[in-house]
A protein has these predicted regions:
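Nucleotide-activated donor-dependent transferases that construct or modify glycoconjugates
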Residues: 3-28, 45-49
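Conserved donor-binding/catalytic core segment of Leloir-type glycosyltransferases
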Residues: 11-13, 167, 216-232, 238-241, ...
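Nucleotide-sugar-dependent
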Residues: 22, 229-232, 281-287, 293-317, ...
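Nucleotide-activated donor-binding/catalytic signature segment of Leloir-type glycosyltransferases, i.e.
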Residues: 250, 260-287
Length: 403
């Protein structure tokens, strides 16, 4: 007979290796971190394809929750309560296109029922196959779904009482989930959150960033943080930089290939006042946002503008730095707040440049930040988000508190 007291863990499953600079991985790791900060016995589970994956000891006992490695802590700005359990995925896993050598299949069909299940109270994942496997094995689950898909949900899963709640970030995706078979009462919209470490003022580190990026103390600094993709408005920002040659622009984020591509583009266009910094570790990003005179959110119009819930926007708020943003459908609810300093139409470099110039003239940089956005963002902490999600879980199914 199974001992119910052994079932204590709140499992967050990610189907990709860590760390990587993808926004969805930042979201998932911070969601797990928040649950741990609330006092739940939280374990972040993800595939490990490194040298340790072939260690016989790890293969014999693959689920071993442990302290989060320093590399992950710095990469995602995590705290010390979160545990991790990398699942060994030795060769030939993911080296051949086959269901039997797919790491997600192995995690769902083997590691979950035989190794993770005995101590698991609740599962939380953006991986639908893992959520399905948990429910089929009698484990309650929470599903996160942040992008439009046309694939219908399996009725036997979405109507199963073990599926506690599904979470998305904008109403348009909630509507498409319902259209695809998710019961309306089982899906909620919740914004992403901000990491509370972004609220800690770091004036010395901010000064170091300005000294590193600016030619002299009188120059202004505009910072963008996020993915380096066209729909995010990077090409627009490059054109804005061309219109404002005396202002320094800096972009944090992107894969090395994307950084190289944009560096080549600005070189060809002979634009010398925009720098691409690549992925900036989260423990360094907070001070970069505080170093800026203005933060840019130049998202373009189009399909992505209807469902994006930009993670970095909440970190922008926490920095207290003035923000210029394009008006896109998914941000409509913020237009009546004081959190964003200036709005302009998307896809228009000249209008964005006008807004930046106005903010630079009317909102001088404050070392302590502007209080409006700092106060506004407090409601969007990852911990508040985690608590809200867990309020939809049956009390008898909640994981163990270890505070």
């Amino acid at each position: 007979m199974k001992n119910p007291t052994l079932k204590k863990h709140y499992i967050f499953f990610i189907g990709e290796e860590l760390p990587q600079p993808e926004a969805h991985l930042v979201q998932s790791t911070n969601a797990a971190n928040a649950a741990a900060n609330l006092g739940y016995s939280t374990v972040l589970v993800y595939p490990d394809k490194g040298a340790k994956a072939i260690n016989p000891v790890n293969l014999a006992r693959p689920f071993q929750p442990r302290q989060t490695p320093t590399e992950l802590v710095k990469y995602y700005n995590l705290h010390d309560k979160l545990k991790v359990a990398p699942l060994p995925m030795p060769w030939p896993i993911d080296h051949f296109r086959s269901k039997f050598t797919d790491s997600n299949t192995i995690a769902s069909k083997y590691y979950l029922p035989f190794h993770i299940l005995p101590t698991t109270k609740l599962v939380h994942s953006r991986n639908w196959n893992f959520v399905k496997a948990a429910i089929k094995n009698g484990v309650p689950a929470i599903y996160e779904h942040h992008h439009h898909e046309d694939k219908p949900f399996e009725p036997e899963i979405v109507t199963n009482p073990l599926l506690q709640i599904a979470v998305t970030v904008v109403d348009t995706i909630r509507e498409s989930m319902i259209k695809n078979g998710m019961p309306p009462e089982k899906v909620i919209k919740l914004h992403n959150g901000f990491n509370r470490l972004f609220m800690q003022r770091q004036p010395e580190k901010a000064t170091e960033w300005r000294q590193k990026l600016l030619a002299d103390e009188s120059q202004k600094l505009v910072v963008y943080a996020g993915a380096l993709q066209q729909f995010k408005g990077i090409d627009v920002l490059i054109d804005v930089a061309h219109e404002m040659p005396n202002v320094q622009f800096a972009c944090a984020g992107g894969k090395p290939t994307e950084v190289e591509s944009y560096q080549q583009l600005v070189k060809e266009k002979q634009i010398h006042n925009i720098k691409f910094l690549g992925y900036v570790l989260h423990n360094e990003l907070a001070s970069l946002l505080q170093a800026a005179d203005v933060l840019a959110h130049p998202h373009c119009s189009g399909k992505a503008a209807t469902f994006t819930s930009p993670l970095k926007l909440f970190d922008y708020f926490a920095s207290g730095t003035p923000i210029v943003s394009t008006k896109i459908p998914s941000l409509v609810e913020f237009q009546d707040t004081q959190s964003i300093t200036a709005w302009c139409e998307p896809d228009n470099p000249s209008k964005f440049a006008e807004s930046l110039k106005w903010v630079l003239e009317t909102h001088p940089r404050k070392v302590e930040g502007y209080p409006d956005s700092i106060e506004f963002v407090k409601q969007f902490s990852w911990e508040n988000r985690a608590a809200k999600i867990l309020s939809y879980v049956d009390e008898s199914l909640l994981p163990q508190l270890i505070v």
